[in-house]
């Protein structure tokens, strides 16, 4: 079946055809078989010929009436057609005629862009007059060309300064056409051939619009939607290095956040908006793909990043050559430089050959150069490199601004050029070296006062030409100077405003003097930042001020002036952009709000907890008892119950310093000199309104708190300045002081060690100090500036102490573990043997050993505690809380069953202690019983221990399991796994036996072991719906999602019983508390137990041998 490939480029080029008949189609047919189209295909745009007997027919040689001819006639011309098309597609493969060579360019362009329409019709035997050959290729009607652009090379791409229209003749120039990759095609059935051919116009085709791919690329780069506001400054960064240096991956990682191993030998030019300290900047990145740096690149950059590969000595050695070559065209001593070593290619097969010390040594040889090592694969230090480059560019501009301000404040003088110094200049200092070919340097007496528009547009201005050339080009007569120029002259302090400041570096001299004086390098020469815009970062201004650079008032007052007449060497788009609209794609309505929030977040810090109260307090030194001084500290109180202090605010701002810290959960606060902590705050006194607040009036005391020093009474009316207006004026507050008492030792010490730096008068009652004491008796004694400040700190710290203690109580109350109620605990006494002590038989038993499963008296409980919790875990029946797993163990064992196991070998001559026995006798018996295990029941012989262990778990036989565990099974035996990797703890969790799982956990069963499917015991407890087992395992230290599949995210979503994985392959299943299997487990009497324990060496357990 013939296939038609529709190469639709209209969607790609965004060009709509005039009619549907012009849609380009290509037909590929095979003369051998319609079922083998894959053997005869032509791949356009790839210069590749595949297939054997393939014919591609020219639509100009076909007619509608030839559709009915026999297909054999078409096959007869295959050989000739194939040869002719091969010659057209590959003109260099043979000696072609002149006419064929002329047509070859058209055919290649047509082939690469799929602008030729082909249809499946039979060839016509017509002959045209004047044709050179019967089979001469007649090109199809070409697509009408759009107005062709004259590409003028700039530093950042192309600019369409002039537009021309192409002719509609068939000999349209396609020299500027760049082949594009072949897009995806659509396969249509052969039935659509006739319909497509009827839509094809037989007359003269109308001209179609054709646009070169470079047009769309430039339109994307220079689009208004991708331009920022005119007030956004540009920062031009150059990236240089060899093709093996990894610079392409570095730039790609910074722009896209992804890694690409492919290197781009031709380089690239990119834009990105960066925000530094809340200010937006447009970063222009130029990846220089050439091995040799040219003049234009060296004069364009504001900073350079030299990139080398730490695995390549060649790329490392090329850095010095590149720096030396750049020094010919640019003074790099004042140019920000960054040396980057990429570690992307380090692997086992390719080791590192350039050490970090060698890289830093090379950076030290290059002045003003920082060194970084990056990894584009993981993104290490990539953002830091470009941020450092941006900061260095801004610092350089600050220095240029300071130099301009200093030059403007100095006395103006007319510059006198000195041409005799040109012999000693370097290349970058020669102004006549970097003039474009479109202009020439005129003698000083022949230069016009104002450069023409064409001169300004076509001249490439470089940094080296300003000191001597630009001053002549910008010296107009005073009568013809514009208002903007006069204002700029007044700002700069020069008669014509054209003398360059002495402090301007060559990297800044490319900009106009107006931009330098203003301190902002704007993307638009007609826009300058006003005085309200923070063009310079605050930290940079501080650094410049500290370095000794004066910031004059003239430099601070920025003047807005129009500089549209000045040339723009490298901005994008061209200089006519001042009349274009400004896109708001980067400036939304809430941009200012987002910027303010960003600044606030930066000021707050990243990753730092915000204190609820902070400030300066005096702290008494506690290092030496002889020399205790008051030192000023910066104290912070946090909401998580922490109190910290730092030496000063600077240390607090440093994120690496944590200061001294105290946990308030274990602390209390009190006022210095008082026995008890302060629970109520001092309340200001109120004066009786009947007395009018006079000196004879007696104030009413609302709240009074006795002090240790308040022992005696003072002479007079018993008050200390109670209603005196002078006292109120002195203290600036109404405050009632209790009756003054004789001074104590604490008051005397306080007066002797009064802090330095306060000018207010203090009496003995105004005690602004307080203490914070923790459980380790560590004292922090602070002193505030006033009583009000002291009370605020006491209230805040006391509130945090209360809150911390409340959280602990709430955590204990909101524990998710199920706790047994009192009736269930009381029911433990009804278990056989629990009515008396398991060791001495005392009927008054209020304590229990939960891991042994016995109830004991209070005296025996003390002895059990001395044994250690690894042997006996003692709990009170009435005092402690009982989780359900502890209660389940107690219900499963009991005193009688436990004594049958622990006193199994008790000899007739051994006497068990009674309640009246001495403590020493009880201690000796309990030690032999539980520590030495002298009477313990041994393990049954004849069967592997691990097999008995799994049999006991599957049978829910707690006592058999207890015997095995008490006889001292090793950790390896307890954690023995089956063929699918499950342990006995997995089995206990799958059957929902919380008592068995708890006993295994107490005997060092590893709950973190996963089976062969990566599932933990939590998975089996959750999948079978055993919530108690799940909570017990989480309490044992497992994470709630440990060893669980991702689709299981909530316990409440799981069914009550759901067996997954290898559970279906077992020969048993569970349903509630029942156990069913293919072979029932023998529940008969226990086997005969030998006199001694038998523990043979056991191999790994096979689960099938247990059941």
Swiss-Prot record:
Composition-biased stretches (Polar residues): 104-118, 434-457, 1062-1072
GLD domain residues: 230-406
Biased composition (Basic and acidic residues): 119-129
UniProt KW keywords: ANK repeat, Endocytosis, GTP-binding, GTPase activation, Metal-binding, Nucleotide-binding, Protein transport, Repeat, Transport, Zinc, Zinc-finger
GO biological process, one term: regulation of receptor-mediated endocytosis
Domain PH: 610-802
Domain Arf-GAP: 822-943
Effect of substituting residue 837 to S: Probable loss of cognate arf binding and production of extra A/PVM neurons
Gene deletion effect: RNAi-mediated knockdown in a ced-3 n2436 mutant background results in the production of extra A/PVM neurons; the precursor Q.pp, which is normally fated to die, acquires the fate of its sister Q.pa.
An example Gene Ontology molecular-function term: GTP binding
Repeat (ANK) residue spans along the chain: 980-1009, 1013-1042
Pro residues: compositionally biased ranges: 138-147
Entry keyword annotation includes Ribosomal protein: no
The keyword Transport belongs to this UniProt entry's keyword annotation: yes
Region of interest: Disordered: 88-176, 405-509, 551-581, 681-764, 1062-1107
Residue ranges, compositional bias (Low complexity): 159-171, 467-491, 560-573
Top-level lineage group: Eukaryota
Zinc finger (C4-type): 837-860
Family the entry assigns: Belongs to the centaurin gamma-like family.
UniProt function note: GTPase-activating protein for the ADP ribosylation factor family. During neurogenesis, involved in cell autonomous neuroblast asymmetric divisions that generate one precursor cell and one apoptotic cell probably by controlling endocytosis. In oocytes, involved in vitellogenin vit-2 uptake by regulating receptor rme-2 endocytosis.
Domain notes: The N-terminal domain is required for the positive control of neuroblast asymmetric divisions.
Protein name per its UniProtKB record: Arf-GAP with ANK repeat and PH domain-containing protein cnt-2
Organism: Caenorhabditis elegans
